[in-house]
Amino acid sequence: MLTHKTCQARKKMQVSFVIRDAEEKQHRNGVNALQLDANNGKLYSAGRDAIIRVWNTRTDSSEKYIQSMEHHNDWVNDIVLCCNGRNLISASCDTTVKVWNAQKGFCMSTLRTHRDYVQALAYAKDREQVASAGLDKAIFLWDVNTLTALTASNNTVTTSSLTGSKDSIYSLAMNPSGTVIVSGSTENILRIWDPRTCMRIMKLRGHTENVRCLVVSPDGNQVVSGSSDGTIKVWNLGQQRCVQTIHVHKEGVWSLLMSENFQYIISGSRDRNIIVTEMRNPSNKTLVCEEQAPVLSLGYNIDKTGVWATTWNSDIRCWKLPMYDRCTLNSSGGMDAQWTQGGTEVACIKGGAAIKECAVLNDKRYIITKDSQDQVVVYDVLRVVKKEQLGAVDYEAEVKKRNKQVYIPNWFTVDLKTGMPTIVLGQEEVDCFSAWVSIEAGLPECVDPTTEIKINYGKLLLEALLEYWTPPHSIPPNEMEPDMHGNGYFQVPKHTPVIFSEVGGRTVCRLLVRDAAGDSESTLLHETAPQWVTDVVIEKNIPKFLKIPFFLQPHPQMTKPERTKKDRLVANEFIQCRKVCEHVLEKVLNAETTPSGGNANNSLQNSQSDANSEGSQLPAEERIELWCNDVVVDPNMDLRTVRHFIWKQSTDLTFQYKTKQNFNYDGSIGDSLERVTRKY
């Protein structure tokens, strides 16, 4: 027995997991942010696949991958390197800010102060201070030295907040000395604070759409902003006004990078262009390159002769920067200024494909996906593995070909936001315990021909995902009874990430399948796992069967239609129609039945009629024919499949029965047909 902690105020929970390889060396979706450690040439990239990756930019080899930093479970929106490259701070759509050991790549602590997506970070190098902001309109200030000192026992941290924002914040910037912090939001204005006092200084109007990117000058006197309105604006904080508006892009400006002397702006846009512009003379501009997708972030290479760029795609490219040369002699003997040639791709870190389409097959076990490179793949949701790589085949044709005429209730949903298939289990709109199937249909490789076992997909999967979880304070099993872990049929990959989160809300816990055996993880699961999970995984309770009511009546062509009244019955929805045939023979026609295989259902026991008759040795489905909506029903179909594909009505399912030509019955129907609701 396990005493599970419950909380009346706890929000409804869901469990999700990702079907993926043990090591994902390539980004599988767009890359939102970059940070370069110029001391060792390491480039950190924040992916929409929820993974931060580290690359060696000093090698000319195509294999630049060093390691992955994994603990987020949604887009990583921003990252900053601090403490001379020893630590990294990240912000994510999973509503958390995380502190990392940048050298070893592990998560040191998680900050859960934000209540919505955390979109942006800002860093004051001289003060070792970080600010975070997001869609909850909040800005929090963090002391980095305090964050990096957090431990399991010393896990209390205080933060200062900057108030006054009235809308979602998408951009944030501080100068190195930490005297000015600026935010940009869907208010279309810039708000400025003094982070030393948390006092609001001013707000600046001028943009007409969301302010997506910001840079503050080292002295804190100037701010450069980029907006979805397509403009770049230069602001003088002393004058509290815009002093320059630059129009070099056709669409929104999403990323800005400044030269060290704050004279040149490198901008990346939704129009896919990266442009260098002289700030004081915007007519002096040049196109660095046209990327393959909208530009999300920019960062210098080690010697600042090139710029790394990320986009909606998963590749990371480095482009040579043109230089502005003022020492060119013109034909009249004067001096001209012109740009040297740039725009050459000098390096590329290749990314992987993102899954863009997904179809759940009717058997509700397999899904078929199509990625950004048109590759089609079949995944086994139950076993959490990639089953088959089909290549660049016709996606729609494969879905149609592999869909069987079988109906199983939806028991999971699929989320493709990260570019990898994330499977979500819950108890809300989709009940993860709704899919009962026969073991023959669900796990044919585990079939024992002497049994008619029914399995529940959701129960089996949760047991496999939490196989290694031994809750604290659980009573040791009886020595005569084995301590059952897992589901007894199969295991899932140990590297699979499992996430517990609030429905439509925040992440509460993330761990790998193999890590559930750890003491801290076990305790965290004990405090986090919802009751519906512990009921099946720990208490080994059986989910409830779903019932279907239906009517049974003689077919008009019956030889002896003595009884025409409908009789209403109720059965488990996964009961196959051959069981209904057995019921007709046994209870309606008073004939002896031979079960179709295995042990008959308790409510469908053999009658006591003559067992020596030749007809009684035939299975019921060879003696009785079931009809529904003027269609002969396959005896292998279950009730829910008949209702979905043949009946197709909201009213109770109705069957008509008649004997086949090779079978005649002499029994009197009489009172053998039950007039009351019968449960199978």
Curated annotation (Swiss-Prot):
Can you tell me which family this protein belongs to? Belongs to the WD repeat WDR48 family.
Which PROSITE patterns would you find in this protein's record? WD_REPEATS_1, WD_REPEATS_2, WD_REPEATS_REGION
Q: Which parts of the chain are WD repeats?
A: 26-65, 71-110, 113-152, 164-203, 206-245, 248-287, 290-329, 350-389
Reply yes or no: does the keyword Ribonucleoprotein apply. no
Per the record, the domain of life is: Eukaryota
Q: Which organism is it from?
A: Drosophila sechellia
**What is its biological role?**
Regulatory component of the Usp12-46 deubiquitylase complex. activates deubiquitination by increasing the catalytic turnover without increasing the affinity of deubiquitinating enzymes for the substrate. The complex deubiquitylates the wg/wingless-signaling receptor arr/arrow, which stabilizes the receptor and increases its concentration at the cell surface; this enhances the sensitivity of cells to wg/wingless-signal stimulation.
The entry describes its oligomerization and partners as: Catalytic component of the Usp12-46 deubiquitylase complex consisting of Usp12-46, Wdr20 and Uaf1; regulatory subunit that, together wtih Wdr20, stabilizes Usp12-46. The Usp12-46 deubiquitylase complex associates with arr/arrow; the interaction leads to deubiquitination and stabilization of arr/arrow.
Gene3D superfamilies in alphabetical order: YVTN repeat-like/Quinoprotein amine dehydrogenase
Q: Which GO terms describe its molecular function?
A: ubiquitin binding
Key words, A-Z: Repeat, Ubl conjugation pathway, WD repeat
Where is region (Disordered) located?
592-616
Record's protein name: WD repeat-containing protein 48 homolog
